[in-house]
Amino acid sequence: MRRLICKRICDYKSFDDEESVDGNRPSSAASAFKVPAPKTPGNPVNSARKPGSAGGPKAGGTSKEGGAGAVDEDDFIKAFTDVPSIQIYSSRELEETLNKIREILSDDKHDWDQRANALKKIRSLLVAGAAQYDCFFQHLRLLDGALKLSAKDLRSQVVREACITVAHLSTVLGNKFDHGAEAIVPTLFNLVPNSAKVMATSGCAAIRFIIRHTHVPRLIPLITSNCTSKSVPVRRRSFEFLDLLLQEWQTHSLERHAAVLVETIKKGIHDADAEARVEARKTYMGLRNHFPGEAETLYNSLEPSYQKSLQTYLKSSGSVASLPQSDRSSSSSQESLNRPFSSKWSTANPSAVAGRVSVGGSKASPLPGSLQRSRSDIDVNAAAGAKAHHAAGQAVRSGRLGAGALNPGSYASLEDTSDKMDGTASEDGRVRAKLSTPLVAVGNAKTDSRGRSRTKMVSQSQPGSRSGSPGRVLTTTALSTVSSGAQRILVNSASAQKRSKIPRSQGCSREASPSRLSVARSSRIPRPSVSQGCSREASRESSRDTSPVRSFQPLGPGYGMSQSSRLSSSVSAMRVLNTGSDVEEAVADALLLGDIRTKKKPARRRYESYGMHSDDDANSDASSACSERSYSSRNGSIPTYMRQTEDVAEVLNRCASSNWSERKEGLLGLQNLLKNQRTLSRVELKRLCEIFTRMFADPHGKVFSMFLETLVDFIQVHKDDLQDWLFVLLTQLLKKMGADLLGSVQAKVQKALDVTRESFPNDLQFNILMRFTVDQTQTPSLKVKVAILKYIETLAKQMDPGDFINSSETRLAVSRVITWTTEPKSSDVRKAAQSVLISLFELNTPEFTMLLGALPKTFQDGATKLLHNHLRNTGNGTQSSMGSPLTRPTPRSPANWSSPLTSPTNTSQNTLSPSAFDYDTENMNSEDIYSSLRGVTEAIQNFSFRSQEDMSEPLKRDPKKEDGDTVCSGPGMSDPRAGGDAPDSSQPALDNKASLLHSVPLHSSPRSRDYNPYNYSDSISPFNKSALKEAMFDDDADQFPDDLSLDHSDLVAELLKELSNHNERIEERKIALYELMKLTQEESFSVWDEHFKTILLLLLETLGDKEPTIRALALKVLKEILRHQPARFKNYAELTVMKTLEAHKDPHKEVVRSAEEAASVLATSISPEQCIKVLCPIIQTADYPINLAAIKMQTKVIERVSKETLNLLLPEIMPGLIQGYDNSESSVRKACVFCLVAVHAVIGDELKPHLSQLTGSKMKLLNLYIKRAQTGSAGADPTTDVSGQS
């Protein structure tokens, strides 16, 4: 069995070329399995990576340092000039090219190869000498944002080209690239830990080029700030960059930041990661060269152990680059650097370790006293990043460590009270941690100068590793199995396998393979507690990485921790072993064996949850082999977290952990607790609420998704105890509804909201929602607004009328909701706000009416109009059901009222406006019902229906058209309908196109409409309220004349509803546009007051329709409105001009012709000053044909301007015309000439000073046309005389 296991494990040697975490460390199989010859400082293989080189030493002599996909500085230098050659003929051409490049790079919607080519084009410009033009540096500043966006791109090729381009800019421009370098360096640092090697190495190489060529002191804080990054690879690289900076820069560039440099290097010398410490020691050399005094002060401030290690390093390295690559442990190594040296571990006393090394054979017995240190046991956490340390002196000649030197008592060291992190000095002066685990790793270990066993470098997957294969995490460690009857571990050195590197996942790795966390079904090993308060070693985590493997600590000093913590290293080792049950059983037996030998009892299993030994569906193979919910499903074993359902404190500690995998396991344990109905104490609840509050912002997707699942169970179990936390819960969930989440996560948030709504008192929820709505510290997004409003609406359906309280907070919230009905950016918000007002009105009509009465007049107008239309439609839709008592609707009682939103149509199933009357309507006739409605409406109509804006800008109206009623909608019954609406340009919600009535023939009778809760197409006339009331509720409607204004309002509402069907119902929309064109010629002021904004916005949106005839018709309608009501465009001039000019780009001639006609009318309709101010920037910046249309339009406008006004506007007009006169398009040049002629016609010879930039030939041509215009020889159409002239 032992041979079989060894063979299986060693089959995975192919992983020995896995790369380190930052994707840029050399490794090869050859160096991993051979004892290297002693190396001298001059040996190039032994020398550390040259800080300035991205490539570094080649692994195996063939591959680049970063491995497949990596790039180095040589690649960059080749790519600098490996670009298409172009020539620059003028600064203007250069500016145009740079503008196009910026446009492409600033928009990530362009194809990625276009963006990559644009980046290459920048290098082409540099090669062509763009840096010699002054305008280049101005445009380079504008390119900063585009370069940053490219460096953040998801396409590695775009990122690579961006990095090469930045490096080239730095190389060519030097310190002139200071602003760009300062902007791009933070983005480049973000590439360092990237899992794609091409991105990581490109970012590193670009930073090196910037450091070499752009010596700007402002870069120093950017680099030093990353020296304290939470990412280990970023810290390593930052110190490497700092070292390069200290080598390359002059002292005067560093003086301003000397203190920062000293502090950063000091932190680096104390860094938790070994390689970061090595790089920091290198930077000390550079610091000493620049600032010897500060360096001396820094040295004196270090603890003795750090001074010793630094001194040893300085002695052993003749230069910065000669440091041997020894002891490059991973960030998970545990060290006690503060512990003083012990004389027995001195390098001058090699006999102290004689018992560890086999000098003459393969089976030398260890000294009795050296049992605690005489094994080659490798702690997985400590050895995960250990580099092979090269032998020296006698240890070199000793060959490899005799594996047989281990006697059966080796496992006793697991319990040895002296097994602590003793400080030992290696040959580079570092203090090493002595750690032990219960796993025997037999490999090609090497020894240092004291005979200390060393292990090979461990390859680590990068953060965010793309591999999800279980095979990537299989170890090649040779593990000897322990038979059930044996009491010792037998190791045969003859068959000892070579130790390979152990691939290990880093923090954000996607690997959730069963092989990482497998625990045998029959294993009695509990999951170790890491974040327990009693286990202080958890706080000594020496890395800032949050890898799951690193969450378990080695044995601590004094052996004073609990059994579960003591076994953490063992379980940590198991997480990287294969999933075979024989391996796991061997580990379990080994652990029990260690306990027996030290006369300790086995660990007590504290966690025995339900189903521990069952094979139910929860542990079946139905789920993915890589599912994080069943790590060991392939073995049928129960995940360890299933056994932790009793220790609430540990579950909470895991939930609060900074390690995402622990948080996830804590949530799973909490789910089990809740499913077992395990209630939490008040203290536990308080702590869990604090943890959950933080988890709403958890950055890890898996944790957040599981948190939402756990939250639902938590609410259901503890809903009676969480009322104090309800505000946080509800507001955070609503905020999450506005976030960009995956559909599945969004559904979980919605489920949590539904459970919350069902679990807590309605009045408490309502008060919290009102409070949240008016909270001035909150600025909810549009999506959050919709979520809040929909929640209030749904809550109102299940509330009792008594739950609605007319408090000051509620009034403020309702006024806020009323303002949301006018939200210009989102129709969803407008619809939802209108629904909320209707729902609250139906919930408790008297109370809500009183609340409206207390609001300012402006808020009353919008709400009253909306509610009136709702009442009208509700009553209108129920007329068809009044004839039979069987179909007569019954209003909602206080206990079971239904919201109108639940019934899409007001037919026989529809409900009358609730709470207007609480008595039985079964015996009421239609007159009784309408008198009841009248009472409610009269209360609403006590408000003022005209805003101050209407009073200040009265328009002419025909009073005869303001009052009255519509045609009778049924025998003996009037249609409850209001009169025309007052103009209220401050109420854009009344223009909401999406909430208009569904298309119904205007003159159909009876007028039975589909119920639409958002309808507000009509409103109450402000001119004759008493007549209005009579019109609404008098049974004999024939006494009132037909109201044309009302008919027009209805028609417009229906037309707009039809026009909202973009890209659909083409023929119907054509008819609607023709009808709208007819309406533009009628003076229905109230209709236009109410609907103008909606009509305009819809027409402008229709200009983007896919049907050209619709686009052309929309422009024609716009032209007619401009002709008949130009004053209304005062506030929309810029938008209208822009959209009309953009239509000139249309590929269909019919649309372009309509756009030209509309632009011509537009030029004569809007005030000349306003029009010129809009057109001038367009003429200067727009491309053909928009600039042509703008120039023609400006020509027409200038004809309307007085001489004095034109003189004032001339500085704005002339630059665009002079620029256009030089345009490549002849038609643009012609238009500029005619525009200049028009200007001359107004101001005469005062134009000449502004023409100084024109060449002689252009002046000659202009004078010719000016003379023609003066003599009239050009005729009515001067364009006929300029063909070929320009």
UniProtKB/Swiss-Prot annotation:
Residues bearing the modification Phosphothreonine: T779
Coiled-coil annotated spans: none
Motif (SXIP motif 1): 500-503
HEAT repeat residue intervals: 179-214, 215-251, 256-293, 702-739, 764-801, 1046-1083, 1090-1127, 1208-1245
Residue numbers spanned by region TOG 2: 642-873
Polar residues composition bias: residue spans: 341-350, 872-884, 893-914
SUPFAM superfamilies according to UniProt: ARM repeat
Segments for region (Interaction with microtubules, MAPRE1 and MAPRE3): 450-565
Transmembrane segments: none
Required for cortical localization as annotated region, ranges: 1009-1286
Main location: cytoplasm
Location(s) in or outside the cell: Cytoplasm, Cytoskeleton; Cytoplasm, Cytoskeleton, Microtubule organizing center, Centrosome; Chromosome, Centromere, Kinetochore; Cytoplasm, Cytoskeleton, Spindle
Superkingdom to which the source organism belongs: Eukaryota
Region (TOG 1): 66-317
Golgi localization, as annotated region: 1-40
Compositionally biased spans, kind Low complexity: 322-340, 459-473, 620-634
Residues with Phosphoserine modification: 14, 20, 322, 333, 336, 374, 376, 413, 461, 465, 469, 484, 495, 513, 531, 535, 570, 572, 581, 614, 620, 884, 944, 947, 1005, 1021
Any one Pfam family match given in the protein's UniProt record, by short name: CEP104-like_TOG
GO molecular function: dystroglycan binding; microtubule binding; microtubule plus-end binding; protein tyrosine kinase binding
Oligomer and partners: Interacts with microtubules. Interacts with MAPRE1; probably required for targeting to the growing microtubule plus ends. Interacts with CLIP2, ERC1, MAPRE3, PHLDB2 and RSN. The interaction with ERC1 may be mediated by PHLDB2. Interacts with GCC2; recruits CLASP2 to Golgi membranes. Interacts with MACF1. Interacts with SOGA1 and MTCL1.
This protein's name: CLIP-associating protein 2
